[in-house]
A protein has these predicted regions:
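DUTPase catalytic domain/fold
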Residues: 1-142
């Protein structure tokens, strides 16, 4: 799918690192240090025009999470089709050491997803005739 993009950074456009990658890696357009338990809004220099009926989700990179405890705070972040501002990524440091972000570092990935708008059917109660019913939060076991 064709998505219009403006790149005001010196970085490459978001890239799919393998043929099977669902997400395209996006890079930092600034330097920052994220302290342990701290978070920062990292600018990318990217502006997109997403077709109506779609969104872009901003998701963590698994390597940053596993190796450094760095993840996207509001994961997945949503970029709506009518947003035209710069893409920013809120990163949080769950690690024990300060984490340096440099210009050009791959900080997150973006995934284009179809959006279905909900048409509500308001009822007084829901059909509770399922085996699970209202059980949740670990009720199916470890």
């Amino acid at each position: 799918m064709l998505v219009k993009i403006v790149n005001k950074s010196s970085n490459a456009l978001p890239q799919f690192e393998t043929g099977g990658s669902a997400g395209a890696d996006i890079r930092s357009n600034q330097q920052a240090i994220i302290q342990p338990v701290g978070y920062e809004l990292i600018k990318t220099g990217l502006f997109v025009e997403i077709p109506y009926g779609y969104e872009i989700q901003i998701r963590p990179r698994s390597g940053l999470a596993f190796k450094n405890g760095i993840t996207v705070l509001n994961s997945p972040g949503t970029i709506d089709s009518d947003y035209r501002g710069e893409i920013g990524v809120i990163l949080i440091n769950h690690g024990t050491e300060p984490f340096d972000i440099n210009v050009g570092d791959r900080i997150a990935q973006m995934v284009l997803s179809k959006v279905e708008h909900i048409q509500w059917h308001a009822l007084g109660s829901l059909d509770s005739g399922t085996k699970r019913g209202e059980k949740g939060f670990g009720s199916t076991g470890k």
